[in-house]
């Protein structure tokens, strides 16, 4: 399927009201670069297109929805090396939180340690959404049975003036407080995050149904 054919399919699935709603959620996105395709339709189309080399290679894409489709396609690739290669190719063109968070390297779920060298590179990157993606991978794959104290240590060292990096850092620590409370609580008690991220972490943890009322009460004292 050519890029023009894919674009025609996307416009056939257009929902203008949804486009207008979605545009309000992504500051800085030019409405002219948004088509307005709902997520379930993008998922279906991603399965139909598959790992189409032509579409994936034609970067940058013109439309936000094409980037979303690209993220879904990469997420569905089962070969680990191919998936990683395509993600690395795509990351420099990711320019918003929605596309960044949409992409998941699910084929590494059983062996996420293979991603660690790449996660470290992403976190050390100067590109906002590479950093966000790296932290997101740590949150997705390394807060359960693959958890190690070195991972929150990595995230705690991030210092950025970028809202979408700091928000992901807060999201990571709030999720970690739900899953690895004892291990990550010292980061909050010792104020090892910058003040904004500390406050946002506590806010998100307090809003979470996965954090106990007892823990929430204590976290309120640490703002």
Task: Annotate the PLM regions.
Residues 1-223:
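Alpha-helical scaffold domains
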């Amino acid at each position: 399927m050519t890029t023009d054919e894919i674009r025609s399919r996307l416009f056939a699935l257009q929902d203008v009201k949804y486009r207008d709603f979605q545009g309000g959620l992504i500051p800085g996105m030019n409405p002219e670069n948004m088509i307005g395709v709902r997520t379930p339709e993008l998922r279906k189309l991603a399965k139909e297109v598959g790992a189409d080399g032509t579409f994936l290679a034609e970067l940058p894409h013109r439309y936000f929805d094409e980037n979303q489709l690209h993220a879904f396609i990469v997420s569905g690739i089962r070969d680990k090396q191919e998936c990683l290669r395509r993600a690395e190719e795509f990351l420099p063109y990711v320019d918003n939180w929605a596309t960044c968070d949409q992409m998941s390297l699910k084929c590494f779920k059983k062996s996420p340690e293979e991603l660690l060298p790449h996660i470290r590179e992403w976190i050390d990157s100067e590109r906002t959404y590479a950093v966000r993606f790296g932290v997101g991978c740590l949150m997705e794959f390394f807060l359960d049975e693959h958890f190690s104290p070195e991972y929150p240590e990595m995230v705690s060292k991030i210092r950025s003036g970028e809202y979408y990096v700091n928000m992901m850092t807060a999201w990571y620590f709030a999720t970690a407080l739900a899953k690895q409370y004892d291990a990550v609580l010292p980061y909050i008690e010792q104020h090892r995050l910058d003040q904004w991220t500390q406050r946002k972490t506590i806010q998100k943890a307090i809003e979470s149904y996965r954090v106990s009322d007892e823990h929430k009460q204590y976290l309120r004292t640490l703002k």
